[in-house]
Each structure stands twice: as C-alpha cells, then as structure tokens.
A protein has these predicted regions:
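Conserved active-site and SAM-binding loop architecture
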Residues: 1-188
Length: 188
C-alpha cells in the first residue's frame, strides 16, 4: 500500500481513507422482476427455495452498498425487488435519455448525488440487424445476426445487463467530476 501523499490534485493514493464515490452495479439476477415467477414454492419446489435464498444473499449484497461508509453513492439495478424491500429508486432512466435508442428502465438509488441530467434524448426505437424495429416496446437479447436468443442462452444475461455508453459517460461526467472540481478550488 502506498502511504505517500500524491503531488497531483487529481489523484488519491490509497491511505486507508474512505471512498469518495461508489457507483455500484450489483448483479440483478435475483432482484429483477423478470424472474419473479420462479419464486413460487408450490410450483417450483426446491428450485424456488434456492432462488429465495439467492435473493436474500443478493439483497444483503445490495444493502452493503447502501450502508457503505461513503459520502456519495449510486446503486444501479433494473426495476425489481429492491423498490419494495428497500425503497423506491430516486430516479429511473433509460439509455435513450443519453443517446442510445434503447428503452431499458434502470433504477438509481442515490445518496448525496444529483439526478442524472439527460444528455441526448433520442427516439427509443430498437432496430435490429434484419432492419426490424420494435419501437422500444420490448427488449430481446439478440445475437450478432439479429436472431432472438433463448432466455437460458448464456449470452442473454450479458446482453441484457449491458450498461450503454451514453449512460456510462453521463455518470462519469456528472458525478465523477464533482470531487475533481471541488479539489481544484483549493488551488485558486
């Protein structure tokens, strides 16, 4: 561990101090509403009991971010269980607010952070390789040729959990720069 202070105002060495900002993207597998049918114990038995246990573990992990010793926290997850268990999200965004023409509701739970300001609102059409447009009504994971993937295809979870570049840029620009600018004022 480096214990020397940095000479650069934009860089902090690890000195066992607190985080400045946490932007968390905890796994949504057991927290999203899309898998709710699998929690029916009468119908799915042991599989449902295991999912209930997995959801409890996922909630515990999510809450570690909520309770982290950090001044500024953002937790991202789709519409799901945490809006009922914990509290409603502070903001619900879509990639089309930030230049990516996709409708995908994403919840943000915030601590001492402003709401993300949309940077480039576009029409939420989903156009696939075959030219078919769904006007953002539904979002299906598709392969590189535009073919809809089965729900249990290993690529589906990765594709559906994608963080779009416009959203990532907005997070970095709007939340990541706050500490930099506040530190720079020390040198004026």
């Amino acid at each position: 561990m480096d214990v020397a202070h940095s000479k650069l105002p934009t860089h902090t060495h690890t000195q066992r101090d607190r985080w400045d900002l946490i932007v968390a993207h905890p796994p949504c597998t057991y927290l999203t509403v899309t898998g709710n049918k699998w929690f029916n114990v009468d119908r799915y038995g042991d599989k449902a009991r295991q999912r209930i246990k997995d959801r409890e573990d996922a909630v515990e992990f999510f809450m570690k971010f909520v309770n982290a010793d950090c001044e500024r926290i953002a937790i991202e997850n789709p519409v799901g269980f945490m809006s009922t268990y914990y509290r409603k999200a502070d903001q619900v965004i879509h990639p089309y607010f930030f230049g990516d023409p996709v409708r995908k509701a994403t919840c943000l739970w915030l601590k001492n952070l402003p709401l993300l300001v949309p940077t480039n609102i576009v029409e939420p059409d989903v156009v696939h390789g075959d030219g078919f447009s769904m006007s953002g009504v539904a979002y299906f994971a598709r392969d590189e040729n535009g073919k809809i993937l089965a729900w249990n295809d290993p690529r589906t979870a990765r594709i559906r959990s994608k963080t779009y570049q416009g959203v990532a840029d907005a997070i970095a620009e709007q939340w990541g720069s706050q500490r930099y600018y506040s530190q720079m004022s020390l040198f004026e």
